[in-house]
Amino acid sequence: MTNKTITLNLGPQHPATHGVLRLILEMDGEVVNNADPHIGLLHRGTEKLIEHKTYLQAIPYFDRLDYVSPMCQEHAFALAVESLLECSVPRRAQFIRVLFSELTRILNHTLNIGSQALDIGATTPLLWLFEEREKIMEFYERVSGSRMHANYFRPGGVAEDLPEKLLEDINKFIEQFPSKLNDIENLLNENRLWKQRLVDIGVVSQKDAMDWGFSGPMLRGSGIAWDLRKSNPYDVYDEMDFEVPVGKNGDCYDRYLVRILEMYESIKIIKQCIAKMPKGQVKTDNPKLTPPTREKMKESMEAMIHHFKLYTEGYDVPIGETYKAVEAPKGEFGVYLYSQGGNKPYRCRIKAPGFAHLQGLNFMSKGHLISDVITIIATLDIVFGEIDR
């Protein structure tokens, strides 16, 4: 009797692939022998498009990469441009950027855990967590005018100061959010079915995690406490007191726990940001980067011309190259910029954490059932906006 393997196409229209992922599965019965991901179905040429835009016009492209956590990607680009310009950022703007980066982390992890539970067959966590995500999206809308594609961070600060009472409302949200998170933990942490589907599934050793270039919860779930907010702090993260949660076994369950614990740490950071939030400007005082105020434009024709030229022609960035990375919710999100002295980047290279994580899907899936592949895809926390770019 001969063993005959079958080939199964999973996706790209399958809801559990979290985007336009096409998987070619080679299977022996229900056991996966090989998983070959086919990517590129959402490729939009983002890096090339950025080369034809000014530095200000390039920011909205970063919202549309990992569209689940947009502000963290804006943060990386803003840091890279600031590095080339050697410009300082007002302290209030730094606190606002850290505050919204951590709100974005909660926004990302709530979706990941909710959709992961839904993939396995639990509907309640998704409904509860979407209720909390809606509140964060309202904060996005109040500060930027948009629920998702915020276009809020700027080289040299942020677009606008916080509206009145926003900090009070964020504080109310983070006071009640731990109890909601505790409800999710009570539902899932010791749930027999949840643990049967996650424990010892998709195990990644510390060596494998390093060899495959994993970062974020995928790396920390394997027990490696590497977090750019600690190892290479940016803005005011060096003033924040927080822990880096790590797992022990490197399986899907540990990665779930790491994301839960990260949300508690994000709450701690947000509380510190609100308590320490200084008064002052939210944009650099460099007139080359900052548009004139409406009052000045009503009084001065030069201010009006300056405003017009800033948004149509942008500003020149000195010749040089830089790489800046942030600890995005999915891992290390990096931006390499090369400037030839003009008002547009000569080259912009984007390093997306999900790209490296997806490459590890094959070795994580081997020997598991097809139903476990769905669990592994969910724990990778992939979004094809950033993978295909």
UniProtKB/Swiss-Prot annotation:
InterPro entries per record: NADH_Q_OxRdtase_suD, NADH_UbQ_OxRdtase_49kDa_CS, NDH1_su_D/H, NiFe-Hase_large
Protein's UniProt keywords contain Translocase: yes
EC code(s) of this entry: 7.1.1.-
Topology class, membrane: Peripheral membrane protein
A Pfam family this chain is assigned to: Complex1_49kDa
GO cellular component: plasma membrane
Alphabetically ordered keywords of this record: Cell inner membrane, Cell membrane, Membrane, NAD, Quinone, Translocase, Transport, Ubiquinone
Subcellular location: Cell inner membrane
Catalytic activity: a quinone + NADH + 5 H(+)(in) = a quinol + NAD(+) + 4 H(+)(out)
Molecular function terms, GO-annotated: NAD binding; NADH:ubiquinone reductase (non-electrogenic) activity; quinone binding
PROSITE patterns in the cross-refs: COMPLEX1_49K
Function as written in the Swiss-Prot or TrEMBL entry: NDH-1 shuttles electrons from NADH, via FMN and iron-sulfur (Fe-S) centers, to quinones in the respiratory chain. The immediate electron acceptor for the enzyme in this species is believed to be ubiquinone. Couples the redox reaction to proton translocation (for every two electrons transferred, four hydrogen ions are translocated across the cytoplasmic membrane), and thus conserves the redox energy in a proton gradient.
Subunit structure: NDH-1 is composed of 14 different subunits. Subunits NuoB, C, D, E, F, and G constitute the peripheral sector of the complex.
Family from the record: Belongs to the complex I 49 kDa subunit family.
Name of this chain's protein: NADH-quinone oxidoreductase subunit D
Species annotation: Rickettsia typhi (strain ATCC VR-144 / Wilmington)
